[in-house]
Amino acid sequence: MPLQSGGMETIMAEIIKTFKEEIPAMRFIGKKYPNFGPWWGEWFANGWFDLIEETMGGSDAILKIWKNGAGYIGLERRSEGQPFEYHIGMLTPANTPVPEGFEFIDFPAIALGTCWIYGKENEVHNTSKCRSLVTDLGLEIWKDDKDGEWSFENCLCPRYTTPDDKGNIILDYCYFVKNI
């Protein structure tokens, strides 16, 4: 949707699809950080995504149970009156061994409310409209036992990694939602 800014029209990223998908129980393996930041670079430099893929038996192991698996994940937890949590890692099959130096979070079989955000790489990370679009589908955001809401950026190959002929990519942004 075009926006007017200083008399000039600017095209920003847009949400092109919102949908519900079912996922099996999975284990997130990664590291926790105090906020968004330059942490992604160390993941690539240290080969940590490769290590997690090897630990789960290759990316095919997750793709067998979730067609949108094998993405690099920026996992977020928000709850009123509690500190924001940010984790980087990958979702793996349940019970995947956790490499030394990493943490894990087990998620039950559940559903996701997913938005596809289409645009330039530096534009697609504005996820502010996704929550309302997910709830507009009649989906209820799932909360953990401490009242926290979980969501994540799912950076999938090739949707996220290979720009189209316009130089745009698609970022999957997902909320854990109740399986109604």
Language model regions located:
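A solvent-exposed interaction/effector surface
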Residues: P2-I180
